[in-house]
């Protein structure tokens, strides 16, 4: 197969591993910095130009699109789709997953367990907002936050109110969420490929920290998932239309709750923690679904 990895940095662990896994299986693989491509949008012979070279006839694409490059990145993925390539994640699913609020709404509609969540931009009724999610303690999140920054635990109603007022003063969009205390600062990253969880790890926040992000000093370990956790992760990825996804779960007293879903999940933490060849699993998935003549993606834009 001819495979394109769309990545801004060939040196990143995830990019290197995907290239290596494709080469080990004798595929013709090219890493393409999608930010430097340009496209010809025409119905007859659409194409992508990169480094003066016309990119054509790719069987499969692996998008590794960072959050800050979503707009142009998904446009390039879409162009490869228009040309008939099978993408490990469709442009549409990537765009959808980048909006945290939209993602929660889609998951809720499918009946997937979520922490009770309220959303607000500029409400005057802060007391009501806090009460809708069950009252303090609550977790308050900036919609644009990442790596745990912009996620606050407010232990009392008064603290929650002050934090919400402060964010409102900054004109920020926020989520207010039921605090899942029984998760005890841990979450579970399920790596989904196709309709399977191929690897999973438990992340534990540093001492006294409720956020489990590795960027905030958390550490990761192998974990055994319950059948319910597995099926929740698979159903969540499917609801989002993602073929490759990192689904983060909280273990609550009433079962697994989906916290968020990532469409370009990193490979380093999960491979090093579990010893699973996740990159290989992604290439295998493409082999099964993107074989020449099998690229039957019929995407509605
Ligand atoms: N409702 C909650 N109850 C308990 N703990 C939570 C809750 N929401 C978040 N956390 C903890 O805080 C951490 C960070 O929250 P979250 O993953 O929502 O934001 P983020 O990590 O900043 O976003 P991203 O993963 O996109 O970078 C989670 O990994 C989890 O450990
Ligand atoms: Mg997170
Ligand atoms: Mg996220």
Swiss-Prot record:
Cofactor annotation comment: Binds 2 magnesium or manganese ions per subunit.
Residues binding ATP, per UniProt: 141, 178-179, 187, 211-213
EC code(s) of this entry: 6.3.2.-
Cross-referenced SUPFAM superfamilies: Glutathione synthetase ATP-binding domain-like (SSF56059)
Top EC group: ligase
Recorded superkingdom: Bacteria
UniProt entry keywords in alphabetical sequence: ATP-binding, Ligase, Magnesium, Manganese, Metal-binding, Nucleotide-binding, Protein biosynthesis
Cofactors that this protein relies on: Mg(2+); Mn(2+)
Pfam families: RimK, Rimk_N
Keyword NADP: no
A GO MF term: ribosomal S6-glutamic acid ligase activity
Organism: Picosynechococcus sp. (strain ATCC 27264 / PCC 7002 / PR-6) (Agmenellum quadruplicatum)
ATP-grasp domain: residues covered: 104-287
Protein name as catalogued: Probable alpha-L-glutamate ligase
GO biological process: protein modification process; SOS response; translation
Binding site for Mn(2+) 1: 248, 260
């Amino acid at each position: 197969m001819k495979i394109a990895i769309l990545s801004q940095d060939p040196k990143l662990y995830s990019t290197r591993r995907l290239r290596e896994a494709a080469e080990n299986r004798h595929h013709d693989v090219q890493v393409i910095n999608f930010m430097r491509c340009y496209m010809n949008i025409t119905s007859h012979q659409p194409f992508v130009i990169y480094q003066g070279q016309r990119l054509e006839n790719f069987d499969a694409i692996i998008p590794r699109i960072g959050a800050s490059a979503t707009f142009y990145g998904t446009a390039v993925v879409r162009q490869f789709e228009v040309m008939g390539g099978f993408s490990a994640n469709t442009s549409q699913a990537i765009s959808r997953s980048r909006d945290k609020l939209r993602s929660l709404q889609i998951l809720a509609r499918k009946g997937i367990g979520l922490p009770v969540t309220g959303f607000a931009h500029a409400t005057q009724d802060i007391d009501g907002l806090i009460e809708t999610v069950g009252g303090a303690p609550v977790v308050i999140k900036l919609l644009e936050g990442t790596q745990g920054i912009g996620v606050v635990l407010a232990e009392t109603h008064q603290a929650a109110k002050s934090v919400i007022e402060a964010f409102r003063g900054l004109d920020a969009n926020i989520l207010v969420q039921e605090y899942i205390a029984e998760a005890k600062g841990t979450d579970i990253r399920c790596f989904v490929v196709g309709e399977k969880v191929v690897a999973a790890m438990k992340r534990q926040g540093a001492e006294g920290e409720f956020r489990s992000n590795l960027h905030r000093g958390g550490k990761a370990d192998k974990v055994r998932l319950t059948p319910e956790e597995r099926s929740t992760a698979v159903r969540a990825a499917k609801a989002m239309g993602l073929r490759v996804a990192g689904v983060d779960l909280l273990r609550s007293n009433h079962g697994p709750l989906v916290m968020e879903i990532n469409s370009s999940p990193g490979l380093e933490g999960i491979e090093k923690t579990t010893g699973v060849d996740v990159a290989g699993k992604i290439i295998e998935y493409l082999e099964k679904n993107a074989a020449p003549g099998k690229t039957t993606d019929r995407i509605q834009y």
